[in-house]
Amino acid sequence: MATETVLATAVSNGKSKGCCKSGPGYATPLAAMAGPREKLIYVTALYSGTGRDKPDYLATVDVDPSSPTFSSVIHRLKMPYIGDELHHTGWNSCSSCHGDASADRRYLVLPGLISGRIYAIDTKTDPKAPSLYKVVEPKEIAEKTGLAFPHTSHCLASGDMLVSCLGDKEGNAKGNGFLLLDSDFNVKSRWDKPGHGPLFGYDFWYQPRFKTMISTSWGAPKAFSKGFNLQHVADGLYGSHLHIYQWPEGEMKQIIDLGNTGLLPLEIRFLHDPSKDTGYVGSALSSNMIRFFKNSDDTWSHEVVISVKPLKVENWILPEMPGLITDFLISLDDRFFYFVNWLHGDIRQYNIEDPKNPVLTGQIWVGGLLQKGSPYKAVGEDGNTYQFDVPQIKGKSLRAGPQMIQLSLDGKRLYATNSLFSAWDRQFYPEIMEKGSHIIQIDVDTDKGGLTLNPDFFVDFGDEPDGPALAHEMRYPGGDCTSDIWI
């Protein structure tokens, strides 16, 4: 169903050449850390799956403490259709193009995970009020590549964009792979070579210095789109593998089976320093942080570096509750990583200066199924039950659990939303279907470590004009530690 949205007029890509002009982003991760403080955040907000017959939208949130509209939504760009399930976002150009003076970080790449559309959003003309530039239709994508369910996008130094797609149009995982778009969002081809598609799709990260791209595994869209069923894991409808590709050729070199220690490996990040051949992946269901690294023979291996133990619980659907690590990120100086436990409700900070041995330096509970007042209780080793204290902000209780996170360039502010995916939200946290999502800010101690909830920042998507909405991924206009790749 269409709603009215005016498409922005195509604008020049600013293709001026010159020795004094550089491309988008920053020359190095440490240069990015010294960049300006964030003033705006773009957030995917959706009504898909909520029962409200409204289009999803891109919310612009004011995060400038000196602004009179601080901690509020100042603009909403509604999509022209209903039912997209906006999810993750990326850029048409980022720090991987820093050496190209003609490149311009102008368009936010906004896939609809369920509809299969990909929107190009102009954020340059008016950063506070983005506009719709172009729509890539799912029919064209399917006809030219056989791909559907677009998820993660990354810009390439060539000017093209690469988008992971999680299945074919019928929702089968076997049809998943990688979509290549040109600089004006025209469908070029599949990136992966014929016969080299991954077992399952989700996230990916590339590192040109090691001629490698690694992708992760969620599950078959026909399974996860209906909610989570543990039997589907046993039935082979969810993944536990990392796929190692030759970059940029698109040939699969190796598949790493993480086994039961790596069920549902979702987000993946290399260290930001492009000379480092290591990084991490967060395994959601197993609730492990897994380090991957390159061997001397050019193969790749892995090891579990953090295990979040499941908690014994009462009154829940299972006798034990996993943490469910659904997102993590790495600070730009590669000193810390942060991850969330969506079900337990905590966010953790670890020092990773020794990548093999992360050290817990901060932890805070900001929601979860086990907060005080919940019908669910954790059971200690002594048999006594307990629940976690979760603070209120501005008189409002924190709902659901921390889900997507975004870190300021200087590493001192961590933002968190609480919606994972509408079908899973409804299953695990039905409250946010009626009360909506929120964004919180956590102040970070980058000297000694530590996390503190900021009492002055709270964006309540329960108060949106068209009704409570679900908020997911966040992006800054100038790039961030999960969008930009240095080469």
Curated annotation (Swiss-Prot):
GO annotations of cellular component type: cytosol
GO terms, molecular function: selenium binding
Tissue: Mostly expressed in seedlings, leaves and stems, and, to a lower extent, in flowers and roots.
Key words of the record: Acetylation, Selenium
Keyword Acetylation applies: yes
Family of this protein: Belongs to the selenium-binding protein family.
Name the record gives this protein: Selenium-binding protein 2
Organism: Arabidopsis thaliana
Lineage, broadest ranks: Eukaryota, Viridiplantae, Streptophyta, Embryophyta, Tracheophyta
